């Protein structure tokens, strides 16, 4: 998890078509460890139990469909601590790399998920050092299982209105947004569709500090015409961003499992 002040980024949740195909991809190509499968969910972590988290939810074609036009998710950037693990991933499954880069610490690569999502895997402190290379000179490590840790470092979202999209997250987190979110202006029929209809990014889940006042945040959002839901225990605040991506925020004392693929949350109410 990535933390900034009062907030931690817990996990993204992606709706997918074929769960097993995606499990194979995240395990073999990205080196994630499958932590558990529960109903339609598959939950991934790292191989040293450092609290890395990444979640997918299977939605079959009779309930969901492919995105028409650009997806809400443009790019996912994932950082690992050990540059050698990037080499081991490339040695194990290099045909999945659509582009290979060389940086100050080592290699990086871009790959495409089964749902046609662009993912960059790297171990750099400065992405500007990455230069495209034709191939990676790597050797396979026989006992390599997967990455020892990973962080969802940044997301790029395709949005209808970049100013409104940025305002939502600025208003919600201020300067404490615990990951980088970039916005690309795009046009398409599914950029604001309900998250249960397409195979796309569905949820961005956050945790708040133990002493953080979710009630005050809920009241602030309501005054600013953003509809949100606060549960009776005052430990879960749920709302959606301008792209209808669900953004649940939970307190640490709330011990219930915190994945919401089947629960409806209020849609955003744009400011006038």
Positions of predicted regions on the chain:
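N-terminal beta-strand motif that seeds the catalytic metal site of vicinal oxygen chelate
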Residues: 1-20, 76, 128-166, 201-204, ...
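Core segments of cupin and vicinal oxygen chelate
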Residues: 2-4, 13-53, 57-60, 105, ...
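Generic marker of residues within folded, mature protein domains
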Residues: 2-4, 34, 46, 66, ...
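Vicinal oxygen chelate
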Residues: 8-16, 64-91, 94-149, 151-160, 178-182, 222-272, ...
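Short acidic, gly/pro-rich beta-turn/loop elements at beta-sheet edges
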Residues: 24, 54, 66, 86-88, ...
């Amino acid at each position: 998890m990535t933390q900034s002040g009062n907030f931690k980024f817990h996990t993204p949740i992606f709706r997918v078509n074929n769960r097993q195909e995606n499990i194979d991809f995240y395990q073999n190509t990205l080196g994630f460890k499958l932590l558990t499968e529960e109903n339609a969910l598959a939950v991934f972590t790292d191989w040293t139990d450092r609290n890395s988290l990444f979640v997918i939810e299977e939605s079959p074609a009779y309930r969901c469909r492919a995105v028409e036009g650009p997806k809400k998710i443009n790019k996912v950037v994932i950082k690992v601590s050990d540059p050698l693990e990037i080499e081991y991933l490339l040695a194990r499954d290099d045909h999945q790399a659509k582009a290979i880069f060389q940086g100050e610490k080592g290699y990086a690569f871009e790959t495409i998920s089964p749902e046609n999502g662009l993912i960059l895997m790297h171990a750099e402190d400065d992405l500007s050092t990455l230069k495209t290379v034709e191939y990676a000179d790597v050797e396979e490590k026989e006992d390599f299982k997967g990455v020892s840790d990973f962080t969802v470092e940044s997301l790029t979202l395709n949005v209808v209105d970049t100013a409104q999209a940025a305002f939502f997250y600025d208003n919600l987190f201020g300067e404490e947004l615990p990951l980088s979110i970039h916005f690309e202006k795009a046009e398409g029929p599914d950029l604001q569709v309900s998250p249960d209809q397409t195979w796309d990014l569905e949820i961005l889940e956050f945790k708040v500090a133990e002493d953080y006042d979710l009630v005050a945040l809920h009241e602030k959002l309501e005054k600013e015409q953003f509809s949100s839901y606060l549960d009776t225990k005052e430990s879960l605040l749920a709302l959606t961003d301008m792209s209808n991506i669900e953004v649940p925020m939970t307190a640490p004392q709330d011990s219930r499992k915190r994945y919401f693929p089947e629960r409806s949350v209020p849609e955003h109410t744009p400011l006038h």
